[in-house]
Each structure stands twice: as structure tokens, then as C-alpha cells.
Amino acid sequence: MKRSSMILWVLLILSPVLAQGQERPTAEVVGDLPTEMEGTSTLFFLDGKLWSCNDHGSLVLYALDTLSGNITDSIVLPGSIYDLEEVTQDDEYLYFGDMGDNNGVRNDLHVLRLEKAALASGAIAFDTLWFSYPDRTDSSARDFDCEAFVATDTALILFTKQWLSQGSSCYSIPKTPGRWEARRLFDIATEGMVTGACYQPERGRLVLCGYNMFCMPFVYLFDGFSGSDIVGGRQQRVELTNGVGWQTEGIATTDGLHYYLTCEHLDAYGITHPAQLLTLDLTAFFSSTSQILSHPTSRSFTIYPNPTIGIIHLPSQGVKAVAVFDVQGHKISDFRNQNSELKIDLRSLPIGTYVLRITCEDGQERGEVVIVNR
């Protein structure tokens, strides 16, 4: 069976979960991006224009028409990039994050800092902020990709893209040139990979964008905080209705309610999707603050270990039953809660990806992807 068919089976397994909760918004297509922008990796406003750039090759900034996605201007900067995934800014500087690390092998992660005034004068000179993660290990390296960061008054705040854990950890480094060890601040249960960030300290608001392992997009909202205390307010994860294949990469806004996103060209797993400029209206989610969860920095229950060599554990409280499916949609086994910690024995299964449909005591269902890897 083709990989795309497998993905559709998994989505059918998870469909009861996806249908629950507040009505999900849709990111509307403004237009396809030109071929020059197929590797779009970021999005930001500067001097009244919406800008993006690609994640590799020459460092060129492209201004996009917000009504069509067409290129209206460009700025060629000196040098080249390896995997530039985000551009952020403060009042004085632009920060270019060459910190993408899909395979967890880079030892040259860095941020290029450029004075905004240099764009007008043409005297382009970058400072470099080198950094590393002190808690990165060989086995966890793929959880230390990073495609989103923001600049506060005192530091750069990085949000990791976790290929293994499907969450994000937040780190900080100083805003000045040098060599730094990133300091871990907190973890976020994004249930997907974070790829972009839009920080609005004057509104006490931060919005992350990303997608899950099926390239289904989501945004993660922080709202109601003061200063740089990002976790001092409310948080909410919002899934979009766009479906499979939307590899969202950048996010930007001018009013804090209506957002622009870009999605990168995708041609993998039997899925082809063009690079596009999108719009997303989040007005209802910031108005209905009573529906925003307070500090959901961990899931309601934890499945561990994942990946596993055979046995995974779930707490008994809140869980009624668990069904195990393969990615073709075939049910493999059922487990019932016997008022003790649930142990799901997968030792008889071959190495691969499986889906758990978890039935909770309140009747709701949720899905979790587990990986058997020996």
C-alpha cells in the first residue's frame, strides 16, 4: 500500500478525535508562491511589507503581495545559508536563524544579526551568535531541530521542533554576539512540530505555527501574559481544517487577530502540494478567552516510553480502553482498564508505526501515534 494510503487510514482511525472540541478554523489560500519561493521558511513584516526567504542557498529576502503572493521586491544579502528557518526582529536588529537540523547532526548552529539601518545604507555586516544545547544527546538529537524563535527585550527565545517527541522545548540565549549554551526554560505539549513564531509583546500575545507528522497544520496560542513571561497567561492549541499536506513554515500579523502564513512546497509520501501564501482569522479564539486552557504544558496523561522496544504504559485514571491499529487501518488488539496502570504489550509486533485509539472514561476518544523501534 502506498504511504499516502497509509496516512489516510491513520486519519480515519483518528477522525473521532479530530471532530471534537471548538470549531476549527481554515487557513484560506491567497495564492501560490512563485518558484523562487518554494522553500519559504519564515514570514515577517518590515517597513510595511510582508517578507519571506528560502531555507537554503543564497540569502535573499522577498517581499510578497498580500493579495496574490507574487514577489514585489527583493533584497540580496551577502553570503549563503545552510538551513535558515526563521527571521525575527527587535527595534534595532534583524536576526536570521540558521538553526535547522532535521537529522540532529549540526555543530554549527548560529544566528546572524544585522542592523536594520544597514539595509538602507547598503553597508551589510553580520554579527554571529553561536549556540549549542547542553542537554542534547545522540539519542535525542532529532528533538533539537529549531525553526522558530523570537526576540524579547533581553534574549532570543528558541522553540525546538521535536521530530521524536512531537512537542517543543523553549530555550533562551543572549542577544549579543558570542558563543552560548542555550538555557532550557519550559516545555510545550504542542502535539506537533513547531515551525514559526509571531511575537507581539505589546498585546501579550505569541502565536506558533506548525504541523503534525501527517503535515496537518495547527497554531498554538499564548495570550494574556505580561512582558516576556510567555507562560504567564493562557494557552491553546488550535488545529486547522486544511487537512494533509499543508507544511506551514512562517507566520506574521499586523493586528494580532488576522495572520498570514506560508506553506512550503511538498512532494513526498505520494502527496504534492504547492508553496502558498495563506490567511488565517483567529479573532474568535482570542475573543473567547474562557475556552483557552490555562498552562497546558503537559498532556492530560503520558504514554511512555515512545518510541518503545515493546511495552508502553498509560495511567489507569481517566482511561477506559485502548485499541491498537497498524497504519493500514487493521485493528491488532484491544486492552481494557483493570483499575491499575495499563501496560500495552507490543513485543509481538514488527518494528514500525502504530496508532492507539484511546477511549476515556468520559466517552471521548483521542489518538496517539507510537513507534516500535528495537
Language-model segments: which ranges?
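Bacterial Sec-dependent N-terminal signal peptides
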Residues: 1-28
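Sequence/structural signature of beta-propeller domains
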Residues: 22-288
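Short strand-edge motifs at loop-to-beta-strand transitions and within beta-strands
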Residues: 340-344
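Surface-exposed loops/turns
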Residues: 309, 350-351
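Short, glycine-anchored, charge-dense loop/turn motifs used at functional sites
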Residues: 325-332, 354
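Residue-level detector of functionally pivotal "anchor" positions at catalytic/ligand-binding pockets or at interdomain
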Residues: 283-304
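Short coil/turn motif common to extracellular beta-sandwich-like domains
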Residues: 305-313
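C-terminal tail/sorting-segment detector
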Residues: 351-374
